[in-house]
Swiss-Prot record:
It holds the Pfam family PPP2R1A-like_HEAT. It comes from the Eukaryota. This is Serine/threonine-protein phosphatase 2A 65 kDa regulatory subunit A alpha isoform. Keywords: Acetylation, Cell membrane, Cell projection, Centromere, Chromosome, Chromosome partition, Cytoplasm, Membrane, Nucleus, Repeat. The keyword Membrane applies. The PR65 subunit of protein phosphatase 2A serves as a scaffolding molecule to coordinate the assembly of the catalytic subunit and a variable regulatory B subunit. Upon interaction with GNA12 promotes dephosphorylation of microtubule associated protein TAU/MAPT. Required for proper chromosome segregation and for centromeric localization of SGO1 in mitosis. Together with RACK1 adapter, mediates dephosphorylation of AKT1 at 'Ser-473', preventing AKT1 activation and AKT-mTOR signaling pathway. Dephosphorylation of AKT1 is essential for regulatory T-cells (Treg) homeostasis and stability. The gene is PPP2R1A.
Length: 589
């Protein structure tokens, strides 16, 4: 390649070569990330004739550099002269698609898929398809796995003779000796099926699907379950029973729990793909078995799908199927030995209320909710409480309130701070559903207790919780019930609690407005400017800066300004700094 002697146009390429050969990975990475700038400077012709061959030859670098290169090349079409020259990008990407590191290969495949759309049909056949064939017939499994992701993007736009060849290559990959290749083929089978003609789906994809679904490796079989969804969507209803269902039944009872888990995980999609009749005859019994599976992971995956499955049952049989076939299984899952299973069920079970309506909810679901509210696992109780809105719409929450209260109190005092945090986040929702009287009587004291929790994240969440409660119940309520308690904390011996008063005033002032802030909260803030602890004093300055915009100008001048000016003379540097900042921001300086 030409040297950079006195020729400015060559300068960027010289820098690039120097940096690409530099010992320092970071420099090599930076130069790769600037590749588009360099290509622009070189122009399309030299990018094609010099830069790309150079890059193709240097593919033996750190994975991070190769990953950046694979990504860059996917956006290079205009830099090589547009679609008619896009095939020049194939050699470096082909090399990248064969490297050992999976992340690099995947990125190269992603870029190849992107630029495939910019090839004309004749260029696809002349350049892209030969690349796919080379990768698919490569000696290393890495190139064969990469090939699997390239069939669906070129298949629709090539001649029928080439299509037949591509199908043959894909068939070979599905029966490759290496499990990693069969896995890659299984994971792309569904998307390949989508671009095939229906006759070929029936005659060629279905046999591949059946073979992969009975592969000796469970990691291959479980990917065939994913493909099943796509294939079932493509076939007419009358073919499903013969072509797909035997394989699906076999997967639902597979000896490997990972395959059964995949069936449970994809159940909603499978259900929609096969339609109401097959659901009634086949999927309902299969779902019952998955809910009773011996492996907890499978039961948990099925539990997650309970609500969606019931929602999607056809209206004529929905209630009957739920009451006679699904509910008995749910009742067993409520007292499952595994807490993940119970927790998964608790996150969706409330959603059955709107489906079953008021009477069935009260008779059948309510006892289950109450049992779950008393469960020893906090996640179960939390999941029930966080989904109360579904039930509230159907039966009103009063039915639950007697059991709710002990559950809420227990969670509010749970030893794990993350559990306490989660219940705080649901408090505004609960408050809105339970009403102000119930809240004041039973929950107000909890909300105040959180303000003095020993974990800062809880105190912080409790503060913003107060704001949301005032938004729900109004500022008069705040004035009567919350503000007096918050202000009382300003005399607490613990300086952290005194600071919490300031944090609460910051957020309450936003929702309570000028009148309440000026008359009731400001005097406390101003008084706290004389606190013995510097941390409290500088938070006074921050609070005044925060609530200043809410106050009227005369209050700012007569009450706030003197206090801030006094704080600028404080012996503590932080107090001085924040007081000065507040004066500046409020335009009082």
């Amino acid at each position: 390649m030409a040297a950079a002697d006195g020729d400015d146009s060559l300068y960027p390429i010289a820098v690039l070569i120097d940096e690409l050969r530099n010992e320092d990975v970071q420099l090599r990475l930076n130069s790769i990330k600037k590749l588009s700038t360099i290509a622009l400077a070189l122009g399309v012709e030299r990018t094609r004739s010099e830069l790309l061959p150079f890059l193709t030859d240097t593919i033996y670098d750190e994975d991070e550099v190769l990953l950046a290169l694979a990504e860059q090349l996917g956006t290079f079409t205009t830099l090589v002269g547009g679609p008619e020259y896009v095939h020049c990008l194939l050699p470096p990407l082909e090399s990248l698609a064969t490297v050992e590191e999976t992340v690099v290969r995947d990125k190269a495949v992603e870029s190849l898929r992107a630029i495939s759309h910019e090839h004309s049909p004749s260029d696809l056949e002349a350049h892209f398809v030969p690349l796919v064939k080379r990768l698919a017939g490569g000696d290393w499994f890495t190139s064969r796995t990469s090939a699997c992701g390239l069939f669906s993007v070129c298949y629709p736009r090539v001649s029928s003779a080439v299509k037949a060849e591509l199908r043959q290559y894909f068939r070979n990959l599905c029966s490759d000796d290496t499990p990693m290749v069969r896995r890659a083929a299984a994971s792309k089978l569904g998307e390949f099926a989508k671009v095939l003609e229906l006759d070929n789906v029936k005659s060629e994809i279905i046999p591949m699907f059946s073979n992969l679904a009975s592969d000796e490796q469970d990691s291959v079989r479980l990917l065939a379950v994913e493909a099943c969804v796509n294939i079932a969507q493509l076939l007419p209803q009358e073919d499903l029973e013969a072509l797909v269902m035997p394989t699906l039944r076999q997967a639902a009872e597979d000896k490997s729990w990972r395959v059964r888990y995949m069936v449970a995980d994809k159940f909603t999609e499978l259900h929609k793909a096969v339609g109401p009749e097959i659901t009634k005859t086949d999927l309902v019994p299969a779902f019952q078995n998955l809910m009773k599976d011996c492996e907890a992971e499978v039961r948990a995956a099925a539990s997650h799908k309970v609500k969606e499955f019931c929602e999607n049952l056809s209206a004529d049989c929905r209630e009957n199927v739920i009451m006679t076939q699904i509910l008995p299984c749910i009742k067993e899952l409520v007292s499952d030995a595994n807490q993940h299973v119970k927790s998964a069920l608790a996150s969706v079970i409330m959603g059955l209320s709107p489906i079953l309506g008021k009477d069935s909810t009260i008779e059948h679901l309510l006892p289950l909710f109450l049992a779950q509210l008393k469960d020893e696992c906090p996640e179960v109780r939390l999941n029930i409480i966080s989904n109360l809105d579904c039930v509230n719409e159907v039966i009103g929450i009063r039915q639950l309130s007697q059991s709710l209260l002990p559950a809420i109190v227990e969670l509010a005092e749970d030893a794990k701070w993350r559990v306490r945090l989660a219940i705080i986040e649901y408090m505004p929702l609960l408050a809105g559903q339970l009403g102000v009287e119930f809240f004041d009587e039973k929950l107000n004291s909890l909300c105040m207790a959180w303000l003095v929790d020993h974990v800062y994240a809880i105190r912080e969440a409790a503060t913003s919780n107060l704001k949301k409660l005032v938004e729900k119940f109004g500022k008069e309520w705040a004035h009567a019930t919350i503000i007096p308690k918050v202000l009382a904390m300003s005399g607490d011996p613990n300086y952290l609690h005194r600071m919490t008063t300031l944090f609460c005033i910051n957020v309450l002032s936003e929702v309570c407005g000028q009148d309440i802030t000026t008359k009731h909260m400001l005097p406390t803030v101003l008084r706290m400017a004389g606190d013995p602890v510097a941390n409290v004093r500088f938070n006074v300055a921050k609070s005044l800066q925060k609530i200043g915009p809410i106050l009227d100008n005369s209050t700012l001048q007569s009450e706030v300004k003197p206090v801030l000016e006094k704080l600028t003379q404080d012996q503590d540097v932080d107090v001085k700094y924040f007081a000065q900042e507040a004066l500046t921001v409020l335009s009082l300086a």
